[in-house]
């Protein structure tokens, strides 16, 4: 396998239970909340001027969009095109790690807030990375 470029890989710390489920093939998606600031900068594509790139399939060019817009249940921005997730259990120096292929993504709204007429207006969004094969797996050394 060709070594992936850093721009193709998203580093994510993860709990051991979820790591083990992904490695064993039980869990096929990894979910992360998209929030203004650091997390949005990790997950959402920006153009050369620093603005989030709109998803042309569900937005209008002359309309302003924000990360918490419900937008008819369609997330208005494009994700960064990661090809792999580099998963690491916790933050210790010795830990389990894996490089996992990303086969796709989707955005899912949750905690939808409605306007005065009862129509959905705002939402917190989660990006779901759809996972493929485990490309590399490194287990921490057990000390006796």
Regions found by a protein language model. Name each.
Residues 3, 7-9, 13-144:
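Structured alpha/beta reader/binder surfaces that contact nucleic acids or chromatin modification marks
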